[in-house]
Design a protein with these regions (language model features):
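An acidic-aromatic substrate-binding cleft motif
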Residues: 1-8
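Short, small-residue-rich loop/turn micro-motifs
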Residues: 3, 37-39, 148-150
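Aromatic-lined carbohydrate-binding/catalytic grooves of carbohydrate-active enzymes
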Residues: 26-61, 84-101, 110, 153-154, ...
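Short, well-ordered coil/turn segments that N-cap beta-strands
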Residues: 29-31, 70-76, 140-142, 196
Length: 196
């Protein structure tokens, strides 16, 4: 299931019926389904101490979906939007991936409607890891799908400070790319530590 739901939308999951969901999974001969823990807007679809549950959701949607999937004999893979969290990006603009001209990727700035990719060389990574840990500790997920994560050159303050601190040249694309690869490698290693 793919849905990225703004805080402006109301009655989230209001008509969800666990029995009907389970029946639909069986009727469709589904063997695996991906269910949302956190969308691109940054909202969680379950109670959380780490993030914020969607303001117009009043029950544990992913918990009910996982239970229904398992009752139907279907694997339940949990989706977390890793590289996008618009709620966090707006509150922490300095942690967004920047181009060399300091514009953002996907949207050129915060006045243009779109999502803003977050840099994994910032405190955002710790926030994301806490969400992953909470999800895996609280739910019986059969897998984890972390979306929007890849090697991406970045010129945010954190990346520039890292390069300069290591005696590297922020104007040298090879050195910026090497940092991007290191940042992604660190991200995957730290995710693996949480998952294992």
């Amino acid at each position: 299931l793919d849905f990225h739901t703004s805080e402006n939308l109301e009655n989230i999951g209001a008509d969800f019926n666990k029995k009907e969901f389970c029946r639909a999974l069986r009727a469709g001969h589904v063997n695996s389904i991906t269910l949302f823990s956190k969308c691109h807007h940054g909202w969680s679809y379950h109670p959380t101490k780490v993030n914020e549950m969607h303001p117009h959701l009043d029950f544990d949607l992913i918990g009910a979906q996982i239970e229904a999937a398992h009752e139907a004999g279907v694997r339940a893979v949990v989706y977390i939007s890793a590289g996008l969290d618009e709620k966090y990006a707006v509150a922490h603009r300095g942690q967004v991936i920047r181009k060399s001209d300091e514009s953002t990727i996907w949207a050129t700035d915060f006045m243009q409607p779109n999502y803003h990719r977050l840099c994994m060389n910032t405190p955002y990574l710790d926030f994301l890891l806490a969400q992953i840990k909470e999800m895996l500790e609280n739910y019986d997920a059969d897998g984890l799908f972390l979306d929007i994560a890849a090697v991406e050159t970045c010129y945010c303050e954190s990346c520039m400070n890292t390069l300069i601190g290591e005696g590297k040249d922020p104007e040298n694309l090879r050195e910026v790319t090497a940092l991007a690869e290191h940042v992604y490698e660190n991200y995957t290693r730290r995710v693996r530590e949480v998952v294992d």
